[in-house]
């Protein structure tokens, strides 16, 4: 029965798939079998059994054994992960950073140039900024009424008034000088010449008066009948300058004749005085 028992054990040990080596018999059982005669008979009857120290079957792996990865060990800390990222992508980081810095520099330069162009357009180059901006005026805006300086008095206006008054005075003086002179009657048979500035009508009146005076005696003609007072005659003679020396002599002779007539008395023939019509 012992060989049948051994065969049953071998059959039970063969279909186990997950064991790499055959199941070895326990050492106590082998010793018991070796000490008895049955073990010798069994060994003689079954020479195909392997020795007890060697495995019964050769290893036959049915599934692949898991092998360790050759790559780096995954980081266990955040800082180590960042360092590993920089080490792997150092070239990419350098290129992207340089491009970003270059773009920022170009944008800043363009903005600065634009501001300078605006400043030069508002403040022309020929005039500095100080002429346009008052740095002392911190508040800005127009000045208050108290800060506005008072205007200096305009002397030209006063001069204009003075010249107008002077012009009016000159005009009045000229009109006084241009008044018509006293109409002098002829003395001693000589008629007085009219003064310059008289009109043609005045000359005609003077000529008609001379003709009437020649018809009547000179002694009967007085200043009162003529209606010309002595004061007005003297005033007009002073206001109007004599045109020539001949006219001055004629007026002097006429005044002397009037004085002599006043001293002698009234005229002898009153009829002659009635004929003379007084002329103003």
Swiss-Prot record:
Residues 21-91 are extracellular. It is found in: Cell membrane; Cytoplasm; Endoplasmic reticulum membrane; Secreted. It is a single-pass type I membrane protein. Residues 38-47 have a biased composition (Low complexity). InterPro entries: TMEM119 (IPR031453). The modification Phosphoserine is found at residue 269. Interacts with SMAD1, SMAD5 and RUNX2. This is Transmembrane protein 119. It comes from Mus musculus.
